[in-house]
Amino acid sequence: MSYEKLLERFLTYVKINTRSNPNSTQTPTTQSQVDFALTVLKPEMEAIGLKDVHYLPSNGYLVGTLPATSDRLCHKIGFISHMDTADFNAENITPQIVDYKGGDIELGDSGYILSPKDFPNLNNYHGQTLITTDGKTLLGADDKSGIAEIMTAMEYLASHPEIEHCEIRVGFGPDEEIGIGADKFDVKDFDVDFAYTVDGGPLGELQYETFSAAGLELTFEGRNVHPGTAKNQMINALQLAMDFHSQLPENERPEQTDGYQGFYHLYDLSGTVDQAKSSYIIRDFEEVNFLKRKHLAQDIADNMNEALQSERVKVKLYDQYYNMKKVIEKDMTPINIAKEVMEELDIKPIIEPIRGGTDGSKISFMGIPTPNLFAGGENMHGRFEFVSLQTMEKAVDVILGIVAKD
């Protein structure tokens, strides 16, 4: 089904810079997310008929309720998307609207080309309306497509009271892209039986498995002396960092893994001879493998310290989130409903693990099972990001189908 305001809504949202900041200690981490919630989303939620629309300064969530139109026994369902965008330029986003007929797409005057040679997924979108970047920023479909889809679905339901449904809760949260958005999620305030994050990618994605995730921060303490007299005296902290990295499995990196394979990812390395620091993320799906990965990292550090006869490798290892499959597989109702709705809409459900995490990972372990629905974005987190309007429309269809089906 086509929805009159969906595209307009989406374009309005993405033009607002809501990039999160991993170095901030505020909640949300950027004021722009607060402003987006209070000056754009909150008035719109109230205007389309949501009730008890309120912003929670304690966690940065904007929450609203669509009252039930039926007194039949059914589940209270929630829909959640995040307001922040990823770590890429989000200032002066200028979307392009392209009626795609195949071939390359010039991204404004940036000199960058969105080409099916580099991104074969473009070939799935012949004849569709694509929204792309101008090559200078990301787009922000992750996850403003999800926000636009939820908002459009709620507007449709509010204007069609003949559609019977139970109470629906909507939540728009901060800081998902830096992994802390759901840390302070208020389960009592949201109060649903189960929920969906609308934060997935291509048409049909339906996900209830995520990585289990840990962060690993290492500090290497060296000893700097003049290199001309360094023999048996210098301890090069940068070399220690390299030695640590070389002892991790060479083929267990993001660029060499897929499917259910886990990895170690070195994403930051800096330092001098005197001191160096490296930062990793550790990811795996199975609990036993996740534990093995963490133990290996600790063992390497311990063995290096033993060989050096002092604690020159300092380890900070901490869990970030866990595979939500452990919670959701206890009651597959939200998956079964979404799968059935997609099939009725001639959408093939793509039930695959998320090689990442969503806010739903943490929310599920807080007591609200929260799988993930497709929102349409492709090539997310960079200048080659795009989304299909037709996929966004089908995401709205699925949301409407879920609340009517239950």
From Swiss-Prot:
GO MF annotation, one: tripeptide aminopeptidase activity
Class of the enzyme per the UniProt entry, highest EC level: hydrolase
Main location group: cytoplasm
Alphabetical UniProt keywords: Aminopeptidase, Cytoplasm, Hydrolase, Metal-binding, Metalloprotease, Protease, Zinc
Pfam family, one: Peptidase_M20
Cofactor(s) this protein cannot do without: Zn(2+)
Protein name: Peptidase T
Record-level GO BP terms: peptide catabolic process; proteolysis
Residue positions binding Zn(2+) 1: H82, D142, D199
Annotated function: Cleaves the N-terminal amino acid of tripeptides.
GO cellular-component term (any): cytosol
Enzymatic reactions: Release of the N-terminal residue from a tripeptide
Residues the record lists as binding Zn(2+) 2: D142, E177, H381
Species in which this protein is naturally found: Streptococcus agalactiae serotype III (strain NEM316)
Entry note: cofactor: Binds 2 Zn(2+) ions per subunit.
InterPro entries, sorted: ArgE/DapE_CS, Bact_exopeptidase_dim_dom, Peptidase_M20, Peptidase_M20_dimer, Peptidase_M20B
Localization of this protein: Cytoplasm
Gene3D superfamilies per UniProt: 3.30.70.360, Zn peptidases
Catalytic center residues: D84, E176
Disulphide bond pairs: none
